Regions:
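Active-site-adjacent loops and short helices of periplasmic peptidoglycan-processing enzymes
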Residues: 1-119
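Domain-terminus/edge residues, biased toward the C-terminal soluble/receptor-binding domains
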Residues: 99-319
């Protein structure tokens, strides 16, 4: 997963690379690359994600990082950025050739969440079958995704990555979406991982609802006269919660104290605060609060629109 997202973010995804001797000689699962063949980096990522091609992983590492060691440096740097505090990468494919190559289920979930925000990664991860022309032969390469949850077992699965080594045993990271709720499941050393993931997803989809905690647009109930009718957030805040958890949610608004020069010059920072969402005292989301100075003409227009909307919905207004 890390190797794939770094390849995609490198800006070289459509670059053609030449497969080296060291890439062809990697042990384990393979997409059977040929030394000296020229292949697009994007095709290598498909071979990596769908067929666990260790040869593809090395070819990607050499193309993006200049060498395997150079690429491993990029992997650990990205892991630090994502917050994977219990992860150390030592190679681009995950084989048991380094003692300190290790991670956790939680860190893998953080990585998958990060990667799934990339459209190209999401598309590749969710591909069931990929076909590409073989550069050296008359026949095409056809790769079927090893993720059986995606291909046959679970209709709500949207992607993932399988894995196996002698030390880690069966490992599996998958994603699923149902009724607007996106979930990630991770298992390590789990012999019955397909059923484990389905069970976790079904349990979560049954118990959790996507709950709206704050609506995109203008913030109401702002008491400060300087900020009143001037503040907004740019996105809806929605979070999966059980009915019991919904009662433990708190929304807190923190604003910068208005400065004298703001009132004198009218020059106010774009971001003037934040909206924090807490569940049982733990921060689950934080959204910037933006300031937008409206002219009296704009305010009059928007007030009329608001009153009209209230009248159409049958609600009463103070005016």
């Amino acid at each position: 997963i890390m190797t794939a997202i770094l390849a995609i973010e490198s800006g070289k995804i459509n670059k053609t690379v030449t497969v080296s001797h060291s890439a062809v000689g990697v042990e384990g699962s393979s997409v059977y690359l040929v030394e000296g063949e020229k292949i697009k980096l994007k095709d290598l990522v498909y071979g990596l994600m769908l067929r666990s091609g260790n040869d593809a992983a090395v070819a990607i590492a050499e193309a993006v990082g200049g060498s395997e060691d150079g690429f491993v440096y990029l992997m650990n740097k990205k892991a630090e950025e994502i917050g994977m505090t219990n992860t150390t990468f030592q190679n681009p494919h995950g084989l048991d050739d380094h003692e300190n190559h290790r991670s956790t289920a939680h860190d893998m979930a953080l990585l998958m969440r990060y990667a799934m925000n990339n459209k190209i990664f999401k598309e590749i991860s969710g591909t069931k079958v990929y076909r590409m022309k073989h550069p050296e032969e008359k026949w095409d390469r056809v790769w079927k995704n090893k993720n059986k949850l995606l291909t046959t077992l679970y209709a709500y699965c949207t992607g993932g990555k399988t894995g196996y080594t002698k030390l880690a045993k069966r490992t599996l990271v998958t994603t699923a979406t149902k009724d607007g709720m996106d979930l990630i499941a991770v298992t390590i050393n789990a012999p019955d991982d397909w059923n484990d993931h389905i069970s976790m997803y079904e349990n979560a989809f049954d118990k959790y609802d996507m709950t709206s905690l704050a609506a995109k647009g203008e913030l109401a109930d702002i008491k400060d006269s300087f900020y009143k009718d001037q503040l907004y957030i740019k996105r809806n805040v929605v979070y999966p919660l059980t009915k019991k958890e919904q009662s433990s949610v708190e929304v807190k608004t923190t604003l910068i104290q208005p400065k004298k020069q703001w009132k004198e010059t009218g020059e106010v920072p774009n971001v003037v605060g934040k909206l924090d969402i807490y569940r049982s005292g733990e921060t689950i989301d934080s959204v910037p609060i933006y300031f937008e100075k409206q002219s009296e003409q704009q305010k009059g227009f928007f007030d009329k629109v608001k009153r009209l909307m209230f009248i159409q919905s049958g609600a009463k207004t103070d005016g």
